[in-house]
């Protein structure tokens, strides 16, 4: 039987997941920290996190559904061309960007799992913040790729290499990929869109594998809690994605870097 506190925990973590999954601040880091503060840890908590991540993924699918279906050859009307070249974003770009992190993730799965703790997250928050600053300070003044369809295969693979940094819990997958994109000549907005689209197969694969391994932790009694978390994460992520894409046309990533440093300091104060 799910009690009211469990539903409260589900709602809070759903908000945290939806709000942070696609911002360059690390959803995993925030989920670990908030989970520790709420006393919601262990195998059941990990299974819950997988479920609500699926809610965030669904939000990306809703926002980019035309582009996603277009990648697999299913077209619903004409998708606007984004960029100044005659190129097109293809499934090949996404697959190339997936290879580095998938390979490294499978090879070092156990090592990565051992890093899911507040101390490791604290260091990753700082490192990810420094990368955001580096992306803003050292990005090309005139990016070659001004839209999604300008991104080359080489740039896609390079972004995939940066994505490997996100295997460190607390680093931020979106932070790593967007920063990487900016450093290799993709403008901030296009890099963000590419990061969100890339998140769908990456997160579906990782979440699907984790869910398969965690099926025995699921019970019908937990269904209300999981439903609250899933729906909350979906709604909040939908709002966060649209708001973020609007904001980055006007602001840099410096505020996000500063926020990461503040959270890292808070983690040190609370957990160290």
Swiss-Prot record:
EC numbers: 3.6.1.27
GO molecular function, a single term: undecaprenyl-diphosphatase activity
Membrane topology according to the record: Multi-pass membrane protein
GO process terms (BP): cell wall organization; peptidoglycan biosynthetic process; regulation of cell shape; response to antibiotic
Encoding gene, per UniProt annotation: uppP
Taxonomic source organism: Yersinia enterocolitica serotype O:8 / biotype 1B (strain NCTC 13174 / 8081)
Misc. comment: Bacitracin is thought to be involved in the inhibition of peptidoglycan synthesis by sequestering undecaprenyl diphosphate, thereby reducing the pool of lipid carrier available.
Disulfide linkage: none
Role summary: Catalyzes the dephosphorylation of undecaprenyl diphosphate (UPP). Confers resistance to bacitracin.
Chain ranges passing through the membrane: 5-25, 45-65, 88-108, 115-135, 152-171, 189-209, 221-241, 251-271
Top EC class, one word: hydrolase
UniProt-listed PANTHER family: UNDECAPRENYL-DIPHOSPHATASE (PTHR30622:SF3)
Catalysed reaction equations from the record: di-trans,octa-cis-undecaprenyl diphosphate + H2O = di-trans,octa-cis-undecaprenyl phosphate + phosphate + H(+)
Family classification: Belongs to the UppP family.
HAMAP family: Undec_diphosphatase
GO CC annotations on file: plasma membrane
Compartments where located: Cell inner membrane
Protein name per Swiss-Prot or TrEMBL: Undecaprenyl-diphosphatase
Keywords: Antibiotic resistance, Cell inner membrane, Cell membrane, Cell shape, Cell wall biogenesis/degradation, Hydrolase, Membrane, Peptidoglycan synthesis, Transmembrane, Transmembrane helix
């Amino acid at each position: 039987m799910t009690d009211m506190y469990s539903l409260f925990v589900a709602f809070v973590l759903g908000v945290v997941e939806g709000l942070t999954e696609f911002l360059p601040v690390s959803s995993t880091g925030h989920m670990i920290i908030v989970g520790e503060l709420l006393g919601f840890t262990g195998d059941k908590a990990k299974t819950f996190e997988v479920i609500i991540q699926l809610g965030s993924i669904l939000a990306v699918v809703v926002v980019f559904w035309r582009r996603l279906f277009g990648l697999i050859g299913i077209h619903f009307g004409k998708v606007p061309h984004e960029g100044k070249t005659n190129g097109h974003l293809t499934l090949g770009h996404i697959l190339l960007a997936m290879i580095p992190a998938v390979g490294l993730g499978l090879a070092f799965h156990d090592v990565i799992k051992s890093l899911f703790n507040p101390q490791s997250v604290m260091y990753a928050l700082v490192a990810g913040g420094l990368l955001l600053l580096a992306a803003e300070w050292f990005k090309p003044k005139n990016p070659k790729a001004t839209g999604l369809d300008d991104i080359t295969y080489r740039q896609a693979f390079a972004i995939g290499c940066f994505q490997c940094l996100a295997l460190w819990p607390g680093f931020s997958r979106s932070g790593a990929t967007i920063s990487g994109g900016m450093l290799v000549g993709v403008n901030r907005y296009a890099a963000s869109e590419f990061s969100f689209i890339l998140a769908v197969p990456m997160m579906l694969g990782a979440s699907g594998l984790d869910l398969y391994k965690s099926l025995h932790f699921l019970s019908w009694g937990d269904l209300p809690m999981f439903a609250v978390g899933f729906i909350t994460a979906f709604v909040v992520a939908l709002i966060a994605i649209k708001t973020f894409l609007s904001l980055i046309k006007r602001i840099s990533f410096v505020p996000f870097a500063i926020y990461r440093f503040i959270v890292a300091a808070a983690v040190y104060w609370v957990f160290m």
